[in-house]
Amino acid sequence: MPGLYTHYTFGREVYKQLENNLVKNAIREHRTVYNLGMQGPDIFFYFPGFPLLNRLGRKISNLGTRMHHSPVNPFFMEMLKETCRLKGRQQQVAIAYLAGFCGHLSLDSTAHPMIYHFTEYKEGVKGNFEIHATYETDIDYCIAQKYLKKSPYNIKTKKEMGMTKYESEVVGDLLCKVCAKCYDMNQWKSMYRFAVRNFPVMTSLFQSKTGRRKRILQRIEKLVIGHYQFSPLVVEKKYKMNSRVLNESHHRWENYWKKELVSCKSFLDLFDEARQVYCCMIDAMNEYILQKKYSVHDGSMRNKYVKHKGSMQSKKKQIKMNRAMDEFLRGVGNRSYRSGLSYDEFYTG
């Protein structure tokens, strides 16, 4: 992933670097939508709808897993196109959400290879998630303390990521339309609306002042599934930080999916690297939205006396929009959330 609070902190920090443009204005107006967008596909890991539908006989893979294992360019292209088809306040909400989603990809694809290395990940081996989640929770504590001077326990997700009914409808409907196209997930709009509203509530349950909630969950998991699954995600008020997870000693690590890619970068190095990647993505996203707006405006001003001239201008505008979209998709890079490698070059996890 990296963890929920690391993504939240990344969003807070990178916002300061963004230029004052159309995208940043939308984020400013809909900050909680942006914060939720920063959680990317992870919101679906906290959504009970998929397990319930499977129990009812509808064989559906978890959308969060599906998105993490699929090429990303088609999703981001459709998200940007659908966002530009919206108008007014709806479009502002969608821009803020997509901007956050871009941040999730930037950090995941940049930092995940290091995390997989130090958690000794092996494809197909059960029990990896417990180690992975514990490692990322340790990073959550370190990053929140470094940048926000507070514990993840003190970050109230219901306040920071809770959307209004209107915002959740816009985001839910947007996801419903795009996921139907990209992942053949033809579910109800209400399911997506519930998923985005449910996430801040569910994650607030993973905060424990005394640690009692975590211990109870551990007992249940041991009894039911034989190992810890979600309990490592519970954050406590008092927690002994393990700063070694940041690799500030710069130990060597390699990409599990392409072992010749070796690095000694720390998590903080990767955090800063992801910022630069993200800012380029947002600049390209902003340019496409501007080109689209100008194109619509010019089209409404045409009349029969300037039809030929208008047609030529329309072609030029289309070329500019295509270039802007290409630039945006280059920034996205079709990079895997897990390996950071491009699906355009070879099949990856």
Per-range role (PLM):
Residues M1-G100, L105-G349:
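N-terminal leader/auxiliary helical segments
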